[in-house]
UniProtKB/Swiss-Prot annotation:
UniProt keyword annotation of Signal present: no
GO biological process: cell division; cell wall organization; peptidoglycan biosynthetic process; regulation of cell shape
Known EC number: 6.3.2.9
List of residues binding ATP: G115, T116, N117, G118, K119, T120, T121
Pfam families found in the cross-reference section: Mur_ligase_C, Mur_ligase_M, MurD_N
GO cellular component labels: cytoplasm
Subcellular location as annotated: Cytoplasm
UniProt-recorded name of the protein: UDP-N-acetylmuramoylalanine--D-glutamate ligase
Source organism: Salinibacter ruber (strain DSM 13855 / M31)
GO terms of molecular function: ATP binding; UDP-N-acetylmuramoylalanine-D-glutamate ligase activity
HAMAP family assigned to the protein according to its UniProt record, in alphabetical order: MurD (MF_00639)
Chief localisation class: cytoplasm
Swiss-Prot/TrEMBL keywords: ATP-binding, Cell cycle, Cell division, Cell shape, Cell wall biogenesis/degradation, Cytoplasm, Ligase, Nucleotide-binding, Peptidoglycan synthesis
Length: 460
């Protein structure tokens, strides 16, 4: 949809959280007639901000006025299955995601990054590379936004053609895209998660992820994990059918185009020549999964003409992301690590694989239908004790506790940390990596991680 078309359109934004409010403000600012509808009560200051932006609104439920529109724009938290979206679809209204709507106004090339795990770290790292590259370039910016916590709609009108936008995009944000076209798309991995949103259909979830390259064509690039079968098949099919330039990342050798490893070094191959970028052990981020994340950032930057020395400096100097294998403190020769963002089994697998010393694992929360089978060998090999926490404590202790020499159950994070400290020996790691959502005890995974961090600091 063009800006002129938006100005002639009445749009209803569904969802009054941060991204929904940002979309409403954006559409109003460019001259659209905008109505926002939200099922729940407004958060503090939300109504006043919408008044200031000239947005009409309703909170506490959806009325018929919400469907008096030409288009619906959905906040990421609003599922397609919701009644209002289904009514809109039956009425023949066009339905778009917030990312789609914001992209209508973007003048800069977009590097869009998705995957079940690793997308926030990769987005932050890629943004760090571009910001380092542009540090001495007047008037050129790297804008990092999307699912990382900064709605695209809040920043898109600031973009210039010389900028680069680095977007973290979730499967929810990739639902209902029609024209969203990144210059570079990155697909890291796909494993079961959020399946309740997709009627427990993994293929539907995977298809949402594939939407990241749905509209790409000649001149665009897809960066994909060659070691993930679903990712490889989908990306290579899109590249062949749509004329997109494929760039693979892999831990198994060096691909024909993309990045991999040879003799302990990262090797880039983006222009039919090998560039030996840097030793693998100089990467700032630990763990197998972060090898993929680092490769993805390197390739994305290189195809956008960032020089190798900048990429090398950025990959070795990056300080990481809170709540993602965040090293909090070492106390009595025990390292305490906050991996609260690990809300699925696959993320915990990566976390356990990242350490070569014994681990005391704190896991549990609100269960997402987890199957712990794949974790059991790693727990047997690497975990000294399992401390089970939250609603799923009984299941975690039953499924994983018996695989470790010791296990226990905790009612609170403070209790969990006390038990973990008691079980740990010098040289060990105490790892909060829950495999579950936080909503049984906390507002979000950030609050859970902040609580863990604060409690660790009391041990000093």
């Amino acid at each position: 949809m063009t800006p002129d078309e938006v100005r002639r359109t009445r749009a209803t934004v569904v969802g009054g959280a941060r991204s929904g409010r940002a979309a409403a403000r954006l559409l109003a600012k460019v001259g659209g007639e905008v109505f926002l509808t939200e099922q729940d009560a407004p958060s503090d200051g939300a109504a006043a901000a919408l008044d200031e932006a000239g947005v009409e609104y309703e909170f506490g439920g959806h009325t018929a006025e919400a469907l008096d529109a030409d288009v619906l724009v959905l906040s990421p938290g609003v599922p397609t299955q919701s009644n209002i979206v289904q009514q809109a679809l039956r009425a023949g209204l066009d339905v778009y995601s917030e990312i789609e709507a914001a992209s209508w106004f973007c003048d800069a090339p977009i590097v869009a990054i998705t995957g079940t795990n690793g997308k926030t770290t990769t987005t932050s790292l890629t943004g760090h590379v571009f910001r380092t590259a542009f540090a001495d370039t007047l008037g050129r910016e790297a804008i990092v936004a999307g699912n990382i916590g900064y709605p695209f709609s809040d920043y898109v009108l600031e973009t210039e053609p010389t900028d680069v936008v680095v977007l973290e995009v979730s499967s929810f944000q990739l639902d209902h895209v029609e024209t969203f076209r990144p210059r570079v798309s990155v697909l890291l991995n796909i494993t079961p998660d959020h399946l309740g949103r997709y009627d427990h259909d993994f293929e539907a979830y995977a298809q949402a992820k594939h939407n990241i390259f749905r509209n790409q064509g000649e001149g665009d690039v897809v960066v994909y994990n060659r070691d993930d079968d679903d990712v490889r098949n989908a990306a290579e099919e899109a590249a062949a059918e749509q004329g997109v330039r494929p760039m693979a990342i892999t831990r198994e050798g060096v691909p024909a185009a993309g990045a991999g490893f040879r003799d302990g070094r990262i090797v880039l191959r983006t222009d039919d020549e090998d560039d030996s970028l840097m030793p693998q052990d100089e990467l700032a981020l630990r763990g197998r999964h972060n090898m993929y994340n680092s490769l993805a950032a390197a390739v994305s930057a290189r195809v956008m003409e960032v020089e190798n020395d900048v990429i090398r400096e950025s990959l070795s100097g990056f300080e990481g992301v809170p709540h993602r294998l965040e090293e909090v403190h070492t106390v009595d020769d025990v390292l305490y690590v906050n991996d609260s963002k690990a809300t699925n089994v696959n993320a915990v697998w990566y976390a356990l694989e990242s350490f070569d010393r014994p681990i005391v694992l704190i896991a549990g929360g609100r269960d997402k239908g987890n199957d712990y089978t794949d974790l059991k060998p790693l727990v047997r090999d690497q975990v000294r004790a399992v401390v089970a926490l939250g609603e799923s404590a009984e299941k975690v202790e039953r499924e994983l506790g018996g695989e470790a020499p010791d296990h226990s159950r905790a009612e609170t994070m403070e209790d969990a940390l006390t038990q973990a400290q008691r079980a740990a020996q010098p040289g060990d790691v105490v790892l909060l990596s829950p495999a579950c959502s936080s909503f049984d005890m906390y507002e979000n995974y950030e609050e859970r991680g902040d609580t863990f961090r604060r409690l660790v600091e009391t041990l000093l």
